[in-house]
């Protein structure tokens, strides 16, 4: 009984500390890339449900990895650091960098979100994704 209680307490503190660490990561990334924390959290929520182990195999032969679902199309640019994507904080930072590039390149959050999702700024083609992220942002 005592072991079970200690185990439960340990798991609780692990989950709380992980949540705090991820919160810090989102804050740091938002500050670095001048993006709203709520938007970054909404992307993570939409992409993986904040699951650092999430892997999604796309139909085009690529896959998405981690909290922010970083696609393997970025492998060449991130090759020396690719294994770091398993670190949720690093994954959030890289996802924020990609979103920042998209927003800066195409001018605007909606086009940036479309670009983040598909590589194209066409909001109409990615309307469901864009509005799903924006709806999720209200939670944060």
What are these regions (language model features)?
Residues 1-2:
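N-terminal secretory signal peptides that target proteins for export/translocation
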Residues 5-15:
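Sec-dependent N-terminal signal peptides
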Residues 21-140:
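Catalytic glycan-binding domains that act on GlcNAc-containing polysaccharides
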């Amino acid at each position: 009984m005592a072991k079970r209680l200690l185990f439960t307490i340990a798991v609780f503190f692990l989950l709380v500390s992980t949540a705090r660490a991820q919160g810090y990561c989102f804050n740091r990334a938002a500050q670095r890339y001048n993006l709203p924390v709520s938007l970054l959290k909404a992307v993570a929520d939409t992409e993986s449900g904040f699951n650092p182990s999430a892997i999604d195999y796309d139909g085009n032969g690529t896959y998405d990895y981690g909290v922010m679902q970083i696609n393997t199309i970025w492998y060449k640019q991130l090759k020396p650091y690719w294994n770091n994507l398993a670190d949720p904080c690093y994954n959030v930072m890289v996802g924020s960098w990609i979103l920042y590039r998209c927003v800066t390149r195409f001018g605007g959050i909606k086009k940036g979100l479309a670009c983040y999702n598909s590589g194209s700024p066409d909001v109409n083609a990615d309307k469901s994704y864009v509005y799903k992220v924006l709806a999720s942002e209200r939670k944060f």
